UniProtKB/Swiss-Prot annotation:
Its main location: cytoplasm. It comes from Coxiella burnetii (strain RSA 493 / Nine Mile phase I). PANTHER family: L-THREONINE 3-DEHYDROGENASE (PTHR43401:SF2). SMART domains: PKS_ER. GO terms for cellular component: cytoplasm. This is L-threonine 3-dehydrogenase. Belongs to the zinc-containing alcohol dehydrogenase family. Binds 2 Zn(2+) ions per subunit. Homotetramer.
């Protein structure tokens, strides 16, 4: 089969041939239809400090996908050949305290598809059957291919009650944009998103935000005044990992405000803890998706009419992966799809 891999400890990815894997008794073999490029894949492509410390070489990469089951292990009775699936990319142990309590997203021994074990940038992928998720017919292949990051957005956005609330999102990358779409869909009053990338702020307008703010040009306080906000934001969703963005968020949160923090800072940074203490702010770290409660919720958000298609901006045949990564590296994209059937 054709595979896109990190074959040597250097920038880039390489397309090559590899043996088609065989599923074990509790696994499924999936023929990949489409994959999407994640920020994690960019880290691996660039071979930055995180990738050098984390990724074994060689490694088939990629973890956002949709495909069709073509072989089922003897113990995987809940699935069948022909099922169209995406999959949870976090493989958990099943035996630790959190796994046994039904909190698999908190497993201390999580292994990542395309990070610690062979990934989805391949014609075929093997994952545990319990990690495969059947896709309703009304959800397109393009949307099914981005359910993994959509799950990050849903986990973050739905962590706190948003109905009637004023919501601030820092970071208009794909997950921030999807979070904004969710907040609007479930009934937030004002949804304000900040970034420094005008291309992505324009995408934010397409998903229905109240205001898309370039934080280098317009103070948040000015936007709040224009919206008639007299207090502060009730809910914050930090998606950027940027220290200054988070510090700015803290200054405009209402007393008793709640923050879901998904962005990954490149290094530790200081904040004004007086903002946290005297405002009685609640800050909740978010990682991955609740298995599989988040999957149920995000599927039904889509089936109830939530449209995240404007976030998908480019699609390339798999053979043109280099062009796809070049576009991603430009910063002028939303989600980028690789088609493995072309």
């Amino acid at each position: 089969m054709k595979v896109l891999s990190k074959l040597k400890p250097a920038p880039g990815l390489w397309l090559h041939k590899a043996p088609t894997p065989k599923p074990g008794r509790d696994e499924v073999l999936i023929k990949i239809k489409k994959t999407a490029i994640c920020g994690t894949d960019l880290h691996i492509y660039k071979w930055d400090e995180w990738a050098q410390k984390t990724i074994p070489v060689p490694m088939h990469v990629g973890h956002e996908f949709v495909g069709e089951i073509v072989e089922v292990g003897e113990a995987a009775s809940a699935l069948a050949v022909g099922d169209r699936v995406s999959g949870e990319g976090h493989i958990t142990c099943g035996d630790c305290r959190n796994c046994r309590a039904g909190k698999r997203h908190l497993c201390r021994y999580t292994v990542g598809v395309g990070v610690n074990r062979p990934g989805a940038f391949a014609e075929y992928l093997v994952i545990p059957a319990k990690n495969a998720y059947k896709i309703p017919a009304k959800i397109s292949d393009d949307i099914a291919a981005i359910l993994d990051p959509f799950g990050n957005a849903a986990h973050s956005a739905l962590e706190f009650d948003l109905v009637g609330e004023d919501v601030l999102i820092t970071g208009a990358g794909p997950v921030g944009l999807m979070s904004a779409a969710i907040a609007r869909h479930v009934g937030a009053r004002h949804v304000v998103i900040t970034d420094v990338n005008d291309y992505r702020l324009a995408l934010a307008e397409k998903v229905g935000v109240t205001a898309a703010v370039n934080s280098t040009k317009t103070p948040l306080t000015e936007t709040m005044k224009n919206l008639g906000m007299t207090e502060g934001f009730d809910v914050g969703l930090e998606m950027s990992g940027n220290a200054e963005a988070f510090r700015s968020m803290l200054t405009v949160m209402n007393n008793g405000g709640k923050i879901a923090f998904l962005g990954i800072p490149p290094e530790p940074f200081a904040i004004d803890w007086n903002q946290v203490v005297f405002k009685s702010l609640l800050i909740k770290g978010i990682y991955g998706r609740r298995m599989f409660e988040t999957w149920y919720k995000m599927t039904n958000l889509l089936l109830s009419g939530l449209d995240i298609s404007p976030i998908i901006t480019h699609e390339f045949p798999m053979k043109d992966f280099q062009q796809a990564f070049d576009v991603m590296l430009s910063g002028k994209t939303g989600k980028v799809i690789l088609n493995w059937e072309q």
